[in-house]
Amino acid sequence: MKSRENSEAMTTSTGHTLRAEQAGSRRRLLPIIILVALAIRMVVVLFTFRGLPFAEEYLSHAQFGWEMGWIARALASGHGFSSPYYPISGPTAIESPLYPGLLAVVFKLFGIYSLTSGFIILSINSLFSAITCIPVYFSAKYSLGARGAKIAAWAWAFYPFAIYFSAGRVWEYALTGLLFTTCFCIAQRLHHTSNLFAWLGWGALCGVTAHSNPAVLSSVPFLLLLALYKVRKAGGRWLLNGALAMVALIAVLTPWTVRNYRALGVLCPIRDNIWLEFYADDFGNAPMDTSSPPSAEGRPYPASSPVELRKYLAMGETAYLAEKHALSLDDFRHHPHYAFLVIKTLRRIVYYWTGYWSFSAEELQAQPFTPENCFYVSCITLLMLRGIRRFWRQNRAALWPYLVLICIFPLTYYLTKPIMDYRQAIEPAIVVLAIAGVLPWRRIKL
């Protein structure tokens, strides 16, 4: 009897020791993955940062973040949140405030459009992308188990899109990816807690993320509803939890909404340029040709059209965007081109998930790596779909939050501009689903 008790005690002790060793191994592994990811991105930064401070007569320093860079320049030079295009102009809400504010701090400390500023901001982007390994790991751990989580984190460290869009581009991609993946990771587990501050914190974090890219707001209500459904099913305080999360979200969005109303006289939570996007990509002067690539020149953006820029400066932002709103609606009423809009939207969906728009000579001349990119993006999508199929069969409850991102988030871009840049907020979730699709079934916990 005593021998059996000793044996059980030894077994229990061994089990605790193994679990402790595994936990310690994971704690050591994640910092290693982050450091490797950062090192890879910093190597790329060394090759890209010198190309940022260039100047053309019209597109001056455009590579420094385009509209966000010009707003950051205005902030750093004392003109406030204004001037979304190269000439100094009035207040703006064309871009969300978080990343231009960060870039303005870099400009203030290291010089506007300086080589040092270019190196610093790309390094910060790279750090954000590397740290995204953390929510990727814990998101994958919740749905795939520890082994799948390790592989997903390593995959993100070496993922080409994650490297390119952080180390080579001055924009909010890496910041939004980090914040939104963290929101998603918390949303997967939110129903497990009855702590009201956790729900408040999640709502506030979603609000902060929206200040980086407001497109995430399309997915937030659905993620919240999924969590509330599980709380209600368990008999918890679902209504109070949901109300607190929404109150926190609205509280974070309200100050910038008030600022926009005072500065521009428009009621918009974050950005006011949605009708410019519709006008440029669906109506007005947009090419009425479904074969035109998404990057086609001649679209009426003030950033790339001197005529539109002069009009913007003469009319002011509010009147200019109101005109685009009126022109879009008028053109849609009188020349709706329904077939064109449907076909072009379908082509955008295909482009978003395959990278394919056209293999015409014009497109291949402008984008010589289009075939290779199509192959790569299509392979990722096929693996993602295979991962979705596996989840659907074995762990459907874990799949629903991923489906929210995959199905809801892209809708805005299906209707406007589906370039691969604007997929980066959900790219970490795509990677996790692709890992679920590529690994042998016996090696992941579904």
Residue spans for each PLM region:
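Short helix- or helix-capping micro-motifs
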Residues: 37-40, 125, 149-160, 178, ...
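Extracytosolic helix-loop segments that constitute the early lumenal/periplasmic catalytic or substrate-binding loops
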Residues: 46-55, 60-91, 98, 105, ...
